[in-house]
């Protein structure tokens, strides 16, 4: 794959209801749906009010249960199949990262860094051990919106929450250190729903920087695609365009193809393994099964792409040679 297929560009910007910003609101809506399930795997009481505060009508109706996501699959000639599984898939994804953070902090790690935290409310809803410091990195307007909205709800963080209001395309390590981050202490990092929204070279830079900032014993959890066949790029785009068309038909204008970066990129797992991380990868179907969920609907017309949930520990920390 050599083309990007993206409408993104260097230095582009967005708000909470458009472009990449709206994807975090979509994720929060899915968490709200998962929280309302009959036997919920997660409990995120802040997802629905955060979606309401953004004000995208269809996403608000999804979050409150007024609209069923399965109703998007309303063309019998081109069924989308897996779209009805979005709440369950979000539940297992959220549970994966929740469990990762709790295991890491209960093992003694006191620093947590959430990259591109979006509408993530873990600093408010997880039972963090004492002394845990949670650093949230995202754009200033994203951080400010979430802080104000949750304060208006009377919510209080359950850890020492420190906001790092900076674009990941800027010097975020300096901003992180300025907030009190200590690279000599082990850290629990998350890259949830992030890597696909980065250009290939930016993904490498991010993973390199995380490694450089990580003391031995640090832990990392990430969501990433694997097994993307270059021959299937156009098929992937067509399927994403069909999903976008269904959203638009119900009043929500979003271009999923334009938000992500296609093209050749290093797969995150071998890339990180080469840099000292010992990782375990769990495909989404296995994660569903481990959480007692039935297999997801099969998209017979869709591409064969694996969504992996990856976690592991840094045992050796490559450091650049000092300048002469």
Swiss-Prot record:
This is Putative S-adenosyl-L-methionine-dependent methyltransferase MUL_0818. Its EC number is 2.1.1.-. Pfam families: LCM. The lineage of its organism: Bacteria, Bacillati, Actinomycetota, Actinomycetes, Mycobacteriales. It is an enzyme of class 2 (transferase). S-adenosyl-L-methionine binds at residues 138, 167-168. Coiled coil: none annotated. InterPro entries: Ppm1/Ppm2/Tcmp (IPR007213), SAM-dependent_MTases_sf (IPR029063), SAM_mthyl_Trfase_ML2640-like (IPR011610). Belongs to the UPF0677 family. GO terms for molecular function: methyltransferase activity. GO terms for biological process: methylation. SUPFAM superfamilies: S-adenosyl-L-methionine-dependent methyltransferases. Keywords: Methyltransferase, S-adenosyl-L-methionine, Transferase. It comes from the Bacteria. The keyword Transferase applies. Exhibits S-adenosyl-L-methionine-dependent methyltransferase activity.
